[in-house]
A protein has these predicted regions:
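Catalytic alpha/beta core domains of metabolic enzymes, predominantly
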Residues: 208-315
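Hydrophobic faces of well-ordered beta-strands that scaffold small-molecule active sites
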Residues: 68-73, 86-90, 140-146, 178-182, ...
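C-terminal extensions of enzymes
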Residues: 313-373
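N- or domain-start disorder-to-order transition segments that initiate the globular core
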Residues: 51-75
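Conserved, mostly hydrophobic/aromatic
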Residues: 91, 144, 180, 216, ...
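Active-site-adjacent beta->alpha loops and helix N-cap segments on the catalytic face
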Residues: 153-157, 182-196, 211-215
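N-terminal chloroplast transit peptides
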Residues: 19-42, 49
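Active-site beta->alpha loop and helix N-cap motifs at the rims of alpha/beta catalytic domains
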Residues: 94-97, 101-186
Length: 373
């Protein structure tokens, strides 16, 4: 820098200010500025590199992905695209939230315009339209849920599932890409039994008790179940008056682990997909589960965590199930076991009510939007 400044002043003294001299002077100044700027930029990059934290050899998400299929739990198409999961799941609550985002207003408009004023039909079309957009991003399955208000009608659940599959087919998405989500009531499990025989694969959700999981595998012979973790933890935190559980002692983690080991011990082919997580500790404690459906926020958290110290937890050697013999399940046994499980009874009912409430809210939004000129 000093060399170029001296050169400039020497030149000014020795030569007159003719046009050609000005050009020469400008060139010298430009070169000095360029070199100085480049030096500053290099220094900034060097400092930035020094401050940048060392990258992990593996993140927690890397470790998890080696042993478990990752599924995105959201209705936000953009969030799914950012996460690049294998599969994606939706439910009425997630669709309700996504439908209020401005970037999906066109999907809402299309669902309304193609339903000829039928709000119920528009609801189904909207769920399918979200599913179609998601299917363009994920290479695997998309789960679309049946109206929770049909949870106690086998016949109506079957009819609705067939309608949803037909809507997907009209848009060129085959049933091999879709899982129909159904609440794991007795009626829902019997509906899944019928649908599975027709080649319509089912994801039985809101599973909180072993009796639900056993019935899904032995009677419904369903493709996949979604046993919940976080909501079970919520119940026992409130009941026991504690703030938190260590991951290995989390009642939700223990429940899913028990279901997983029961299936593996007795040879059931139904896929276990843990759901409803409250923290990353719950997730990593279930590393090795067939699948885990995880919210975008927790996926980001796992991606930022050092994977050192985490390892596969489920599926190590012979399954450890100490609950006795295989359960001979029928309707009477199912209803009695569910009745005796306070947590499962309460959470199943609350889950159905919650999904139904969000369906009503979404119907209201569509009705109001339809009324606008």
């Amino acid at each position: 820098m000093e060399f170029w400044v001296v050169s400039i002043f020497d030149t000014i003294k020795e030569i007159s200010m003719h046009p050609i001299t000005l050009i020469y002077l400008v060139a010298l100044l430009a070169r000095a500025f360029t070199l100085t700027t480049a030096s500053i930029q290099f220094s900034r990059r060097a400092m930035s590199a020094m401050k940048k934290p060392r990258l992990f050899a593996k993140t927690a998400l890397d470790v998890l992905s080696e042993h478990t299929v990752i599924v995105a739990d959201t209705g936000d198409v953009g969030a799914i695209a950012a996460q690049k999961p294998q599969d994606a799941t939706t439910n009425p609550s997630l669709i309700f939230k996504a439908a209020q985002l401005p970037q999906y207003s066109q999907l809402v408009d299309d669902a309304l315009s193609s339903s000829e004023g039928d709000i119920g039909l528009a609801m189904d079309k909207l769920a399918v339209k979200f599913g179609i957009e998601i299917s363009k991003i994920v290479p695997g399955n998309v789960s679309t849920e049946v109206d929770a208000r049909l949870s106690f009608s086998t016949e109506k659940t079957v009819a609705k599932a067939r309608d949803l599959i037909a809507m997907y087919a009209e848009e060129g998405v085959g049933k091999d890409r879709i899982l129909i989500k159904i609440a794991a009531t007795w009626e829902g499990i019997k509906a899944a039994e019928i649908l599975e025989k027709e080649g319509i694969r089912c994801n039985l959700t809101l599973i909180f008790g072993l009796c639900q999981a056993v019935a899904c595998a032995s009677i419904g012979k369903v493709t996949l179940i979604s046993p919940f973790v976080g909501r079970i933890m919520d119940f026992y935190k409130a009941k026991q008056g504690v703030d938190k559980f260590a991951p290995a002692e989390d009642p939700g983690v223990i429940s899913v682990t028990n279901i997983y080991n029961y299936y593996k011990k007795f040879g059931h082919k139904t896929i276990v997909m843990g759901a409803s997580f409250r923290n990353s500790g719950e997730i990593m404690e279930l590393c090795g589960c067939d699948r885990l459906t995880i919210s975008p926020g927790l996926l980001d958290e796992l991606r930022s965590m050092d994977g050192a110290g985490y390892e596969k937890k489920l599926g190590l050697g012979a399954p450890i199930y100490d609950g006795g013999d295989e359960i001979a399940m029928d309707e009477e046994t199912f209803r009695w076991m569910l009745n005796e499980d306070e947590m499962a009874t309460e959470k199943l009912a609350a889950g159905i009510r919650g999904f139904a409430a969000d369906i009503v809210k979404l119907e209201k939004i569509l009705t109001e939007k339809k009324a606008k000129p």
